[in-house]
């Protein structure tokens, strides 16, 4: 078939014979894919040839890492799988960080990589890399296609695997000759995946055990993770917490799963969590974890974590239950379905009046804080508060990793699900800007703010060109402290102020750099300038880069030092 010949899904089923590349395009249409993030190259040219005039929207980043992080942002906000294409060799290996990020944060991606022709696989051919071997630890599943007829079945399976159970990335490696050879197309394959049957319905006996545990607990607390968001269970979590009057703490990735202004909300738990959330986890007698995996950044020293508590762990991934914490009440199932079942049980509320009194006292005595002294420079915490104020709390906030990420989590109270896009488990610098692009493409009318540091921003700043090309109204707010802030903080506290390679001796002019990309750039150095310029920038429908000079020696508090328990926080008060 020639380059410009169009074959829609109906005619494809009728004619049956087509190239592997066209099978890929038609399969994506069957899966109702609307958007692809990709970067062409030699091994995927047959695919890009069939993509031409296919009707599918393709986003061309300026680096493959930008493609996969944008796909992550798209998946996180839309709930749909992000689709990525990259060529063989370096194109494929440039995706590894994004795959690892999506794997640990449970984001559904379907990633297509080109490969050298089957006849030269294993010969160190030009741009050959064993991408299956390289990515096996960081993908939920992976395939290498050897016959074009297998492509529709494999793609159908890949979307199913990526989006069911615990979501994750699936990689499909396509040799160039497989993309050009013709074969019979059919998308009517029955799904047959022996050994892959995710459990969504909970065991009734375990539900009863949990109901009984709640009725007898004096100090219950819920730890809600990203599994609540992946399961679209925010409303059920709120209803269950209110029904049983159980306070709720969140992991970093779980923010937005429970309204931050709710009386039962304790805040974020963990290394930079609130005093109340951390002490609640330390002192509770029943801990109900929902869609959280007891990451070390949440638990602190395990010897001290929830030391007197019975642990109930609700998770769709049975491999997570008992992996870190000994669990007395394991519940395998989808968070939404499990919570619906718990609500139906309408168990007896525990007598936790003294517990609630204690939590209220902690909230009153130990709020999040910072010293608002502008002689030390414009405080980044105040900047985040202004962003919240000027966006009315309705923005989608995408961040990089570091101090600015923690301040965003602490001082931008999220009321709704799917407004918070960040790299949690892997902690990937350079994530924020491309993820914001993906989020904006998923929600075209939303206000999307990329909050980044001056370090991480420079890892993927070339994606500004995508923002300009598509005229996306992304707002990029750079917390510019002229250093790697979190690294500098650790060096100050734990390494006797030996600031080894954490301060930037020189930097580009970010305003001029933005203007070179055709994007408006503004600079803010004080609270007065923030009041004057920030609201207009954040409420416009044009892309803007905002370079904010913030206090360089500001630290993120509270903080749990490595090896310490959650109750051993430092910096809980000025």
UniProtKB/Swiss-Prot annotation:
Pathway: Amino-acid biosynthesis; L-isoleucine biosynthesis; L-isoleucine from 2-oxobutanoate: step 1/4; Amino-acid biosynthesis; L-valine biosynthesis; L-valine from pyruvate: step 1/4. Its EC number is 2.2.1.6. Its cofactor is Mg(2+); thiamine diphosphate. Transmembrane segments: none annotated. FAD binds at residues 166, 272-293, 315-334. PANTHER family: ACETOLACTATE SYNTHASE CATALYTIC SUBUNIT, MITOCHONDRIAL, THIAMINE PYROPHOSPHATE ENZYMES. Belongs to the TPP enzyme family. Contains 1 molecule of FAD per monomer. The role of this cofactor is not clear considering that the reaction does not involve redox chemistry. Dimer of large and small chains. This is Acetolactate synthase large subunit. It comes from Bacillus subtilis (strain 168). The lineage of its organism: Bacteria, Bacillati, Bacillota, Bacilli, Bacillales.
